[in-house]
Design a protein with these regions (language model features):
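Fe(II)/2-oxoglutarate oxygenase catalytic core
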Residues: 15-199
Length: 199
């Protein structure tokens, strides 16, 4: 009789062990799936990234190069989508090169992979509807974006990430750093961002 009880208990233990193993396998699979899911880091704000003299130099160099901003590679002008002026500064400029090198310390990219410094001027009413900085089929896809505030003292102009429910207001000299792709280097809707109208 005691032997039979022992056998019954053994069967129960085996059943419990099988169930526990089953649960552990399920938990392991869930963790694996979560690990393999695409991830996207939140944008980072770095305060006082540029000095006042650097900001003044960049503004001075860009002033005579400003042109109406266009949309993407199409070179189209549509102020309903984007209203600003753009200038591009060469990396040969010592100040520009120093700023770019400082940015690159937060990435794994060499300066040869970096674009020229894009300077944007937003007047009252200037804005940029939510958009992506990376495009399908682009071999030279932008991987990281640094938005540097060259001045402040205005209302509006926050950088928003609608799919992250995040909004960032920068002071002069601050930089906003974010990835344009997910951890698998695919375009992600989480990187969608825009500039609110300047008042």
């Amino acid at each position: 009789y005691s032997h039979k009880i022992q056998l019954c208990n053994t069967k129960k233990l085996l059943s419990v062990n099988i169930k526990m193993k089953g649960k552990l396998i399920v938990v392991a699979l869930i963790l694996l799936i979560l690990y393999l899911l695409p991830s996207y880091p939140e944008p980072i704000v770095m305060r006082n990234f540029l000095s006042e003299s650097e900001r003044r130099h960049i503004i001075s160099e860009a002033t005579n190069k400003l042109e109406t901003s266009t949309i993407s590679h199409n070179k189209m002008v549509d102020e309903n989508i984007r209203k600003s002026e753009t200038a591009w500064l060469d990396k040969d400029d010592k100040v520009v090169r120093n700023v770019i090198n400082r940015c690159l310390k937060h990435t794994d990219r060499p300066i040869t992979n970096c674009e020229k410094l894009q300077v944007l001027k937003y007047k009252s009413g200037g804005h940029y509807k939510p958009h992506q900085d990376a495009f399908k089929g682009d071999d030279n896809m932008r991987v990281h974006t640094f938005i540097i505030a060259l001045n402040d003292g205005y209302r509006g102009g926050e950088t928003t990430f609608p799919n992250l429910n995040k909004s960032y207001k920068l002071n002069a000299g601050d930089v906003l750093f974010f990835d344009t792709l997910d951890n698998y280097n695919f375009i992600t809707s989480k990187a969608l961002h825009g500039g609110k109208p300047v008042e």
